[in-house]
């Protein structure tokens, strides 16, 4: 095996390697017009302006960047003065967002290196563990580069002459498919534990290998994620699982023992000997999510979290069923119990937990194929998502495939044929029809949020 080089140290005096335009493949034709407008206006106003980060990396790889980030020596207030369509955001990192319709160009100011901060500097604050809580001390590009995380993300495209500035051999790492942290990996992870999740995400997304020294602390430092605000972890979780590489991200998280810090109840369930069906459902569900992203079909966090949390919810519901609860109420109560525990790790907004609960509470209702019950279920606004979840359960061997096939066939019929099918099922069937007052459940018949 080829020996991998050590990560570069903080050589503050190291000059940038300037890669001229003829020697790289980054073309303005592949940069969005709004990003070019921001770059050119900053330049014409006398400021330095560089495209930086994942946008440059993806262009070098021949990929279409998801977004374009810009860095400059203009302060956030100076950027706001140049663009009427700009607003400043962030307390931890002050940033300018320049909006062009639905596209937002993020503009950051060069940051100073860590050792330049005074201990009582209110613009740079760390906690006792070294985690950066606020970082708004500005510097120049020679300092800014060492504040970035991975060498592949520390490439600067200069709009002045279309060259790329490379301080830490990032272009070589991109070409080699190597993910390498800048500086001492353990110190960088302690500065911002989310970098561990970013390492996993980029490795999954790009198919890069994680360099040995960058990889080494991952499994040992997972506890640092416990101190990250749950709202921030929600956003990072969406990036991990909704970018088209959910299954690979999940496998990396499990490999580095990071998954348990995000989804402890799900991780415990996966460790049980009788969790085969949940493992199949989870991996099939994540693979299905990746396929939908690839096909540009819509995906929702509600369905994603239903997949990730179904194992512990299902087990809790079975315990309640054994105590005499009805199936819908059992799943409703189990959802509440698991969601409350999960919120201490990842703060999932109610606009997603409510439809997630609907999807899961509808599962027992698929067993009832008689008359009006089936027709009402078919008309439920979340029927399609719940049906897709039923298909995953059938594929995992959790319910009979015949049940899923019946609901598939029912949807292919016209309304009159559907009524004949369910009425015939009612007359043939499993249960004597009788009139009774329908009891409302707390979970299965919720209105669309």
Regions found by a protein language model. Name each.
Residues 1-449:
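Catalytic cores of the polymerase beta-like nucleotidyltransferase superfamily
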């Amino acid at each position: 095996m080829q020996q991998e080089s050590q990560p570069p140290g903080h050589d503050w005096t190291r000059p940038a390697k300037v890669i001229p335009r003829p020697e790289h493949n980054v073309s303005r034709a592949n940069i969005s017009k709004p990003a070019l407008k921001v770059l050119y206006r900053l330049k014409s106003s006398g400021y330095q302006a560089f495209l930086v980060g994942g946008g440059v990396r993806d262009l070098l790889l021949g990929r279409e960047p998801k977004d374009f980030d810009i860095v400059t020596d203009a302060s956030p207030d100076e950027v706001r003065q140049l663009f009427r369509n700009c607003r400043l955001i962030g307390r931890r990192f002050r940033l300018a967002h320049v909006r062009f319709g639905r596209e937002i160009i993020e503009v950051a100011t060069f940051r100073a290196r860590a050792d330049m901060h005074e201990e009582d500097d209110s613009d740079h604050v760390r906690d006792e563990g070294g985690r950066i809580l606020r970082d708004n001390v500005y510097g120049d590009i020679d300092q800014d580069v060492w504040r970035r995380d991975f060498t592949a993300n520390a490439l600067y495209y200069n709009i002045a002459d279309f060259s790329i500035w490379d301080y830490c051999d990032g272009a070589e790492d991109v070409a080699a498919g190597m993910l390498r942290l800048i500086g001492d990996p353990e110190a960088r992870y302690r500065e911002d534990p989310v970098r561990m999740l970013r390492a996993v995400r980029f490795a999954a997304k790009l198919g890069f290998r994680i360099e040995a020294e960058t990889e080494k602390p991952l499994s040992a430092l997972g506890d640092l994620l416990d101190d990250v605000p749950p709202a921030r972890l929600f956003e990072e979780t969406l990036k991990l699982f909704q970018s088209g590489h959910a299954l690979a991200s999940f496998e990396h998280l499990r490999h580095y023992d990071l998954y348990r810090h995000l989804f402890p109840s799900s991780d415990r369930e996966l460790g049980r000997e009788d969790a085969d069906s949940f493992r199949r459902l989870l991996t099939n569900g994540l693979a299905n999510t990746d396929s939908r992203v690839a096909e540009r079909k819509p995906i929702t966090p509600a369905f994603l979290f239903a997949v990730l949390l179904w194992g512990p919810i299902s087990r809790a519901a079975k315990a309640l069923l054994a105590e005499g609860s009805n199936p819908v109420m059992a799943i409703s109560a189990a959802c509440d119990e698991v969601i409350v525990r999960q919120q201490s790790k990842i703060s999932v907004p109610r606009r997603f937990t409510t439809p997630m609960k609907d999807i899961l509470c509808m599962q027992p209702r698929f067993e009832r194929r008689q008359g009006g019950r089936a027709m009402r279920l078919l008309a439920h606004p979340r029927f399609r998502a719940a049906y897709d979840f039923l298909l995953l359960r059938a594929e995992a061997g959790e319910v009979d495939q015949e049940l899923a096939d019946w609901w598939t066939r029912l949807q292919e019929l016209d309304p009159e044929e559907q009524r004949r099918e369910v009425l015939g099922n009612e007359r043939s069937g499993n249960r004597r029809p009788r009139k009774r007052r329908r009891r409302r459940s707390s979970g299965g018949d919720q209105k669309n949020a």
